[in-house]
Amino acid sequence: MTRIAFLRHGPTDWNAQGRIQGHTDIGLSQAGIARMAALRLPPLCDGARVFVSPLARARHTARLLGLEDGNTDARLMEQNWGAWEGLTRDEILAQ
């Protein structure tokens, strides 16, 4: 049986600030690095093929979890939010 698991990248400073990231290549925050480094995946993930977004936050998360990030796929990137990237919801509504 084929199993598919999805894991979101670790936290970034923009996540903490409520900012839209989209395609902007924001790295993990220090708290995000610590959080991902402390996680352990279940044994059923051993030897799994891993596919990640080409964005640094996704690739770094994979490496911190002991996963190879060699299979990058742009289709896994977050939506491109254009001019809204980097803004908070309140900033967008104020425009």
PLM regions with names:
Residues 2, 7-68:
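Active-site-proximal alpha-helix that buttresses catalytic centers in soluble enzyme cores
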Residues 65-95:
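Phosphate-handling substructures
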